[in-house]
């Protein structure tokens, strides 16, 4: 038996290709060794139209009987209506020389490259058809919490509590050393090893609530009272005129030396501090001082003095009227 020549099918429909193979196999069974392309396409088209008509008629008989799925009886009625004998189908099926149609080669499905795939994709559930797209990657279902999980280990909790307690005690000690009186552990360095003075105050929270920028205690109030009531002697004024400017300088030096100082009795710690440190940082508590007068500037309220040696007698100049009268 001659082999049928290979025929190229231009159509890419897979069902059309299967029908083309069926027609070629039937031609081989009947002894046809060769077939042209046009005849093979014509026979394929005729077989396709026959199968379509059989299926359409069987569907109509099925709906006429009130059913949705056709049965063997519906197909038999469709064949009989088209004039095809059913009795010849049984011996044709039992024919031993029948050559089966080879199955189409199974093509290996190319797996899509999942470069960013994490994990194994979950299969479809039973109610999802297989032709649906695959499920997403497992990382798409990961739920990332936005907060940190609390630490529940016993050792970590105790260590954290101990660190917090140590930091609180250290900060409180530094705060008390800067705001209250302290004792020095060693006499060399004052700020190396400070100790909090054991002087309880009542109530203890009053020191923290009161402002500490300027504290007015009784000693400072006493000093403020002394400065406010302080009086200074005015410098002596000369009624007459002095002979020279040198005498003015000598008298000015004597008046400065004769100014009495403020008598402050060292009866308190504040007065001692005043005597030791006369310079006061607070400008409002500082004693008022008179501005220094220069050598050439006169004292306010007095006329400038003139020496007799330097002053010359004034000569009156005659007017033009007097000159004319004398000439006449």
Curated annotation (Swiss-Prot):
Record flagged with keyword Phosphoprotein: yes
Annotated localization: Nucleus
Keywords per UniProt: Nucleus, Phosphoprotein, Transcription, Transcription regulation
Highest taxon of the lineage: Eukaryota
A molecular function GO annotation: protein heterodimerization activity
Subunit structure: Belongs to the TFIID complex which is composed of TATA binding protein (Tbp) and a number of TBP-associated factors (TAFs). Histone fold interacts with N-terminus of Taf10b.
Official protein name in the record: Transcription initiation factor TFIID subunit 8
Phylogenetic classification of the source organism: Eukaryota, Metazoa, Ecdysozoa, Arthropoda, Hexapoda
Gene: Taf8
């Amino acid at each position: 038996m001659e082999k049928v020549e290979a025929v190229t099918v231009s159509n890419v429909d897979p069902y059309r290709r299967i029908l083309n193979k069926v027609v070629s196999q039937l031609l081989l069974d009947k002894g046809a060794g060769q077939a042209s392309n046009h005849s093979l396409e014509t026979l394929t088209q005729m077989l396709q139209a026959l199968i379509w008509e059989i299926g359409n008629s069987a569907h109509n008989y099925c709906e006429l009987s009130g059913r949705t799925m056709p049965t063997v009886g519906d197909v038999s009625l469709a064949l009989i209506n088209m004039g095809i004998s059913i009795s010849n189908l049984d011996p044709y099926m039992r024919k031993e020389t029948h050559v089966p149609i080879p199955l189409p080669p199974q093509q290996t499905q190319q797996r899509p490259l999942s470069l960013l795939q994490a994990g194994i994709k979950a299969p479809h559930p039973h109610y999802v058809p297989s032709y649906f797209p695959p499920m997403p990657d497992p990382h798409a279902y990961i739920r990332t919490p936005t907060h940190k999980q609390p630490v529940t280990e016993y050792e970590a909790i105790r260590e954290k509590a101990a660190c917090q307690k140590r930091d609180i005690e250290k900060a409180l000690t530094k705060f008390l050393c800067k705001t209250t009186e302290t004792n020095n552990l060693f006499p060399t360095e004052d700020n190396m090893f400070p100790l909090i003075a054991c002087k309880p105050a009542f109530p203890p929270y009053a020191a923290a609530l009161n402002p500490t920028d300027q504290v007015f205690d009784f000693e400072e109030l006493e000093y403020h009272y002394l400065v406010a009531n302080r009086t200074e002697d005015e410098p002596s004024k000369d009624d007459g005129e002095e002979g020279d400017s040198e005498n003015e300088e000598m008298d000015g030096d004597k008046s400065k030396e004769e100014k009495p100082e403020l008598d402050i009795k060292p009866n308190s710690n504040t007065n001692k501090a005043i005597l030791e440190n006369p310079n006061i940082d607070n400008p409002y508590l500082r004693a008022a001082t008179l501005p220094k007068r220069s050598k050439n500037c006169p004292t306010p309220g007095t006329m400038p003095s003139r020496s007799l040696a330097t002053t010359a007698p004034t000569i009156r100049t005659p007017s033009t009227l007097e000159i004319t009268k004398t000439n006449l």
